[in-house]
């Protein structure tokens, strides 16, 4: 069972996490920390696989938690889901290029996507919890995703992958958006062809 630290006092976030984790109670155990020091202590001693850091909660010093994790290599297991109040802060946090951050969501998109995020993360644990290890020991990273038929899943899969490549300095900021757009287009086309039974030759002929 994977532990999820939830550093938040926002009832909207707490309710969503409780509801989703009830459905996945066999796999995820949420630990709620409404205090910054409590959250840091839990991270230090329990090393939770997932950390949900809520930048919408005024009572939580989210930047301090993020900095503490970034500064200590022992805490670089698993990953961070950051929830922020607006899109401009999404960009600001992504530009920090912290490889511990899996994804940054506004409160609105988090409420829409958290259950989907949990399902995807559970189904792709190898990529989630081992990412970066091969690079640190001088090896080469590789992995696979198993993606279903939901177009929204494609958006999240590409976000995970492209964000990791960007944060680990494998692609530039311009390259990040170009790669995300390309992957979205390729995977969406593949999904459409698979669902409709349309071959590449047939589509080319009609176009």
Language-model segments: what does each one mean?
Residues 1-4:
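Extreme N-terminal starter segment of soluble prokaryotic enzymes
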Residues 185, 189:
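Conserved polar catalytic motif of the HATPase_c/GHKL fold
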Residues 34, 83-127:
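Output/docking surface of receiver
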């Amino acid at each position: 069972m994977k532990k999820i630290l939830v550093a938040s006092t926002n009832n909207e976030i707490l309710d969503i996490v409780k509801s989703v984790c009830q459905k996945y109670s066999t796999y995820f155990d949420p630990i709620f920390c409404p205090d910054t020091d409590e959250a840091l202590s839990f991270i230090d001693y329990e090393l939770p696989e997932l950390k949900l850091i809520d930048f919408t909660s005024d009572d939580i010093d989210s930047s301090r938690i993020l900095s503490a994790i970034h500064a200590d290599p022992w805490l670089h297991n698993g990953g961070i889901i950051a929830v922020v109040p607006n899109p401009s802060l999404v960009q600001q946090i992504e530009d920090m290029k912290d490889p511990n951050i899996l994804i940054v969501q506004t409160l609105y998109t988090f409420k829409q996507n958290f259950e989907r995020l949990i399902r995807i993360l559970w189904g792709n644990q190898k990529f989630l919890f081992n990412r970066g290890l091969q690079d640190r020991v001088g090896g080469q990273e590789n992995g696979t995703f198993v993606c279903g038929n939901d177009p929204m899943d494609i958006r999240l899969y590409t976000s995970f992958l492209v964000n990791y490549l960007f944060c680990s300095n494998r692609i530039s900021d311009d390259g990040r958006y170009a790669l995300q757009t390309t992957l979205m287009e390729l995977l969406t086309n593949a999904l459409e062809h698979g669902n409709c039974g349309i071959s590449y030759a047939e589509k080319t002929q009609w176009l």
